[in-house]
Amino acid sequence: MKNIIFLIVFLMSGMCYGQKDFIWEKIDSVPKSKSQIYSDTKLFIAEEWKSAQSVIQNDDKDAGIVLIKGASTQNIFFQLNDHIYSFYYTISFYMKENKYRILINNVYCYSGRCGNYEWPKMDCSDSYPGFKNAGMNENRYFTLMNNLKNELQAIFNSYIKFISSPISPSKDW
């Protein structure tokens, strides 16, 4: 009897987990030293975010890791109001000699507001969680998720382009 109950609970727990995290990852080689990749990564962060020091959570040059915690605000207009959803995400930059890795993950909604009212915090997923969990219909949900994914994809692509560009010319200007 215990085994049957355990099996039922085990199977149900897998079905109850609804959030499927958005993940972007790339590992590639570039003709740059670890130090140059690190410097270029810090420069990219400074150019991409308004306050680079406030988003950097971990910065270890020796280990070749820079970890940032970013935020994104997505607006969608429906029911005659502007609904504002705020999301957090983590970007990890790893670097070695002639090699880098970028990883974007831990994307989640931490706030949903419409005026003074709090809306449900929705899962970030490629599948519609239902009206009760999303607080909006399927079409609006996918519009919001696509806008969020496009923003994160743009950051991902910008970094790859930035880090792959050749080493800047001489500093004698």
Give the positions of each predicted feature.
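Bacterial Sec-dependent N-terminal signal peptides
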Residues: M1-F22
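Ser/Thr-rich, low-complexity intrinsically disordered terminal regions
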Residues: C16-W173
